[in-house]
Amino acid sequence: ARDSVRDCDANRQLRDGIAELVVESLEDIRDRGMLAMSFLAVLPNEQDGLKEFYQPICIAAVNAFREKPLTPTRSGSHAPASKLYRGPSKICAVLADDDLSLFTEQTPPLWAANPPQQNQREDLFLKSLRIKPWGWSELSEALDCYFDQDQRNRIETWVSQKTDAWMTSFYALLGEGFEKDELSIFCHDRMKIKWIRVVCQNNDTHVLPTEAFLPPDEMTSFPDDIKFVKPSVYE
């Protein structure tokens, strides 16, 4: 039992050797395809209440995950935890690594994989890695382009390259954010971004939210002088 191990020089040397072995083994475990999210459940976390004697093993494991490409990512690869972000599953489901790269100016992979349940062992170990959060408040800040024309242009170019199906998911995400007060009203008032996709004969066109109208249900043809939201982005 752990409690029966004496804190002496010989045992400290053995403990330090175990810590080194754990770190050395992690890359081999990853290369064998076994370093999945479920594996994190077997690693020590802060709620285990381990005695100070065993802390070097925990610290070595955490440092390895932060500094080496060991942390499972949403894209299926592994990356240093220090270079990753964690966010709500609903945001991660809409914004891929390349999308997050636009807002963070960092190189993918960027999203850490999310555990199946919060506050379980996998989640507790991920919390110990101090992965940077990127959630609703960060999204709200990223979309506030009132004083940043360059960022506004980048977002408008980004939106113009998206499919109608993706735009539907993105609008739904924003709608939920505002409905649940996750995105600030302040942000809403300052979103001067042309990202509402409207009906156009040739190419997708985007306008400010205040410039677009939802068409009546029975409308099948659209006049050129009124900017109607493209039905395929909200139906």
Language model regions located:
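GHKL/Bergerat-fold ATPase module
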Residues: 1-235
